[in-house]
Structure formats: structure tokens, C-alpha cells
């Protein structure tokens, strides 16, 4: 289980609950991070990042 929230999540990454329900897309650009609260959205279990560079 990852610890993040929609605001702090990486832009271009989709966040899902444990049963595969889409929750949100991340809003924070790695090159220009948003000022986000550091809390864990307990609904978020994993992410998929189809548009991220690298992996």
C-alpha cells in the first residue's frame, strides 16, 4: 500500500483503490511540485503511471 493523496500524487499517474476502483489522477508535477498536505488517502492502494517518463 502506498502513502499519498490526490494532490501530492504524480501528474500523469492514476490512483486506484485495492479493488481496482479509479480514485483520481495525481495533481503534482515532479518538476514543479504543488504545496500539498502530507497525509495518506487510505483509499489509495496503488498507482499506474502510463505517461511517466522512464519506467
UniProtKB/Swiss-Prot annotation:
Disulfide bonds: 3-40, 6-24, 7-36, 13-49
A GO molecular-function annotation: serine-type endopeptidase inhibitor activity
Similarity remark: Belongs to the protease inhibitor I20 (potato type II proteinase inhibitor) family.
UniProt keyword Disulfide bond present: yes
UniProt keyword annotation of Disulfide bond present: yes
Keywords in alphabetical order: Disulfide bond, Protease inhibitor, Secreted, Serine protease inhibitor
Subcellular localization, as worded in the UniProt entry: Secreted
Protein name: Proteinase inhibitor PSI-1.1
Originating organism: Capsicum annuum
Amino acid at each position: 500500500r502506498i502513502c499519498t493523496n490526490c494532490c501530492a500524487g504524480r501528474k500523469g499517474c492514476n490512483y486506484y483503490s485495492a479493488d481496482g476502483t479509479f480514485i483520481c489522477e495525481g495533481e503534482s508535477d515532479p518538476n514543479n511540485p504543488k504545496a500539498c498536505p502530507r497525509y495518506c488517502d487510505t483509499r489509495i492502494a496503488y498507482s499506474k503511471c502510463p505517461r511517466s517518463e522512464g519506467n
